[in-house]
């Protein structure tokens, strides 16, 4: 499988509703009416379907269903429906699992299709929700939560938390929290429910299980990823919302009976399939909800579903907002997708963030918010939604600027940083905004290789309406396609600064340009390697000699203790030893003299035998380098001069107190600990000023001293002993 990141691909074929009552399982409803033919599966039942143009077909199906078809087509569809009815009992048993699958991921594979659901069973006490102790709140309220994407993944959770799991869309006209008038209607629903339970209690409590099954056809190499994303974001949340309504108003069972009644009536009158489905969608809110989920999710859109006047939910698979890869020859291209390696959440950006947190849940405080549509339009939608977050969202949107990071907006507006991150995360999740590195005039931007040139004509007209008095879109793209230079060089004057930043935001929003970012790694020269090698060998020799010296002292003390016993034999022993040594040709053993079996063994514990000392190396992760690379780094730092030496071409005398050269005067040994963690080849150096709260000019002077040559600093002549970086620039 290619490493290229892919946009959401639901691979959705159909949605099935199964319920189980005292009489047994029942196949209640499915959409679309003929899923195999509509998704192109009938022609190739043993392989992958040739195309996945089902989204357009499903979107157009509603109009064709409502308008009807010819009588011949209706008869054929009715005949097909009657044939499929004979196999309904098979699907009923297959998709109706045992109680052990309660609130767990249920998955069945048949050929290329996967049937995935989240079965919900009635509790042993006959209720659908655990009864909590009543405190001040006596009425259950739908708490779908306007940030459903913050749900902690897991299949088994407390029932009280499940109400918060289903995601909602604050920017939709439907709100999740019931208003006072809605609560009154909830009370009337409960009273009517109590009356109906008294009249027909046997039927009301007869359902024991329901299962909304999603039929999927994912590519083989992406099977687990596609199944998991639609299960976590759609299947589980939709089933939890239905469970909430079932516990509150017996919703699923009532709708299942209503759908069955309409189908029986249509069967008696020989109603066509298209007419039947039009009637079901118009008269059953559950059938309409399933239809809405299928139509929107299969098209990778947001599905806003209203289950009742009090409860509405919004479901989606989080969209892919950017990609760090260009598509290869065998990959599907997605022109217009933002091409960048900038990730709104990385361990370096936010060390306190949970590594298991999804990228769209927590945004780094040093990122900024780029609205994907006009601010006035978004504010209008927010005010129309009337949700609990509406006032806070409106206030934050008015304060937000793509040139200011979340931390800077928090300091300027007084809004807590955690609140800003939550609101920005909400806007990003619901496709209203994008998290980007803050726009700056010293940054470099260029035309994206992934821009969609097929939309250039349409984009030019829209650009002309937005910026009628400024250079045209082709001229701006042509200027940005030249030699890379800071964006500020394109701004004619300070009066044009705001307008040109608006142009840059517009270009980024449409994927026309992207930021040229700089990355660097520390280069270790052969000279550094040899110096460390010699130092390590000296340490080994010193260690060996110190060990041998201690043993010599021990042997010498023993020898002095034995001299009193052997005073009479000294002469004879000495002469015999000398003769023996001369005959054998061996050297006379003396205390402390080197013995043949006592060799110098260098441990080389820090040395890699495969490391070449004649070639340079790059250190991948200097902030957590292994022992040998740490010694290399120490040797590099030890060679930095105590007093920086530099000169500027064209200037003979430079004032040492001139703030323009502040980054050139400080000793590199003092600056090194601040910068070293960014020299890993993955963290862009453009983020250093933002994260370390330093001036950009000072930062780039320091980086230039370290060997990162850019056009703006090439006039500075620096000390070669400090130039230890290898740089590369890309998106």
Swiss-Prot record:
Cleavable signal peptide: 1-23
UniProt cross-references to InterPro entries, sorted A to Z: HTH_NPRL3 (IPR056603), Npr3 (IPR005365)
Annotated function: Mediates inactivation of the TORC1 complex in response to amino acid starvation. Required for meiotic nuclear division.
Protein name as it appears in the record: Nitrogen permease regulator 3
Domain of life, source organism: Eukaryota
Gene name tied to this protein: npr3
Family membership: Belongs to the NPR3 family.
GO terms classed as biological process: cellular response to amino acid starvation; meiotic cell cycle; negative regulation of TORC1 signaling; positive regulation of autophagy; TORC1 signaling
An annotated GO cellular component: GATOR1 complex
Compositionally biased tracts (Basic and acidic residues): 139-156, 555-566
Skewed-composition ranges (Low complexity): 58-70, 572-583
């Amino acid at each position: 499988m290619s490493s290229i990141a892919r946009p959401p691909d639901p691979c959705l074929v159909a949605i099935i509703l199964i319920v189980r009552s005292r009489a047994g399982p029942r196949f209640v409803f499915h959409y679309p009416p003929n899923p195999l033919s509509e998704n192109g599966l009938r022609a190739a039942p043993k392989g992958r379907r040739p195309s996945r143009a089902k989204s357009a077909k499903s979107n157009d199906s509603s109009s064709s269903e409502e308008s009807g078809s010819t009588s011949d087509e209706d008869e054929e569809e009715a005949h097909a429906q009657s044939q499929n009815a004979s196999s309904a009992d098979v699907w009923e048993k297959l998709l109706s699992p045992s109680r052990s699958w309660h609130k767990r991921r249920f998955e069945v594979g048949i050929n290329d299709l996967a049937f995935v659901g989240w079965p919900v069973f009635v509790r042993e006490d006959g209720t659908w929700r655990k009864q909590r102790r009543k405190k001040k709140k006596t009425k259950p309220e739908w708490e779908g939560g306007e940030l459903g994407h913050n749900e902690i993944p897991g299949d088994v959770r407390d029932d009280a938390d499940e109400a918060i799991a289903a995601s909602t869309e604050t920017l939709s006209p439907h709100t999740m929290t019931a208003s006072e008038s809605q609560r009154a209607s909830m009370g009337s629903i409960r009273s009517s429910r109590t009356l109906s339970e008294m009249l027909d209690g046997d039927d009301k409590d007869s359902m024991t299980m329901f299962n909304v099954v999603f039929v999927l056809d994912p590519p083989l190499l992406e099977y687990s990823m596609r199944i998991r994303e639609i299960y976590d974001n759609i299947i589980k949340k939709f089933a939890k919302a239905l469970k909430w309504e079932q516990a509150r108003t017996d919703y699923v069972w009532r709708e299942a009976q209503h759908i069955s009644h309409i189908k029986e009536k249509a069967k008696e009158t020989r109603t066509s399939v298209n007419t039947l489905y039009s009637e079901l969608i118009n008269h059953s809110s559950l059938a309409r909800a399933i239809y809405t989920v299928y139509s929107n999710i299969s098209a990778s859109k947001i599905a806003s579903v209203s289950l009742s006047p009090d409860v509405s939910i919004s479901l989606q698979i989080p969209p892919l907002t950017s990609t760090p890869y260009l598509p290869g020859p065998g990959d599907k291209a997605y022109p217009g997708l933002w091409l960048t390696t900038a990730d709104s959440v990385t361990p370096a950006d936010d060390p306190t963030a949970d590594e298991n947190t999804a990228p769209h849940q927590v945004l780094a405080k040093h990122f900024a918010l780029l609205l994907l549509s006009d601010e006035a339009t978004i504010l209008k939608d927010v005010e129309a939604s009337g949700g609990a977050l509406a006032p806070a969202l409106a206030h934050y949107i008015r304060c937000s600027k793509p040139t200011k990071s979340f931390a800077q907006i928090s300091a300027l507006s007084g809004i807590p940083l955690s609140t800003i991150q939550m609101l920005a995360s909400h806007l990003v999740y619901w496709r209203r905004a994008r998290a980007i590195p803050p726009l700056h005039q010293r940054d470099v931007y260029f035309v994206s290789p992934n821009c969609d040139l097929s939309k250039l004509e349409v984009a030019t007209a829209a650009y002309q309406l937005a910026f009628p008095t400024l250079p045209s879109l082709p001229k701006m793209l042509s200027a940005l396609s030249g030699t890379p230079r800071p964006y500020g060089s394109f701004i004619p004057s300070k009066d044009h600064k705001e307008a040109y930043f608006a142009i840059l935001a517009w270009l980024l929003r449409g994927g026309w340009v992207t930021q040229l970012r700089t990355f660097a790694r520390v280069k270790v020269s052969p000279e550094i390697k040899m110096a460390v090698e010699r130092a390590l060998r000296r340490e080994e020799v010193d260690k060996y000699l110190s060990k041998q010296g201690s043993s010599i002292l021990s042997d010498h003390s023993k020898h002095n203790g034995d001299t009193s016993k052997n005073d009479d034999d000294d002469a004879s022993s000495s002469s015999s030893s000398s003769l023996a040594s001369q005959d054998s040709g061996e050297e006379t053993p003396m205390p402390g003299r080197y013995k043949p079996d006592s060799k110098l063994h260098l441990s080389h514990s820090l040395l890699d035998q495969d490391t070449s000392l004649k070639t340079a190396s790059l250190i991948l992760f200097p902030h957590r380098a292994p022992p040998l690379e740490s010694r290399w780094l120490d040797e590099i730092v030890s060679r930095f001069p105590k007093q920086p030496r530099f000169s500027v071409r064209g200037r003979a005398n430079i004032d040492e107190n001139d703030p323009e050269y502040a980054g050139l005067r400080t000793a590199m040994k003092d600056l090194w600990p601040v910068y070293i963690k960014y020299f890993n080849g993955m963290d862009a150096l453009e983020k250093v000023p933002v994260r370390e709260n330093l001036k950009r000019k000072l930062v780039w002077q320091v980086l230039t001293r370290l060997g990162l040559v850019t056009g703006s600093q090439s006039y500075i002549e620096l000390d070669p002993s400090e130039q230890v970086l290898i740089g590369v620039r890309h998106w």
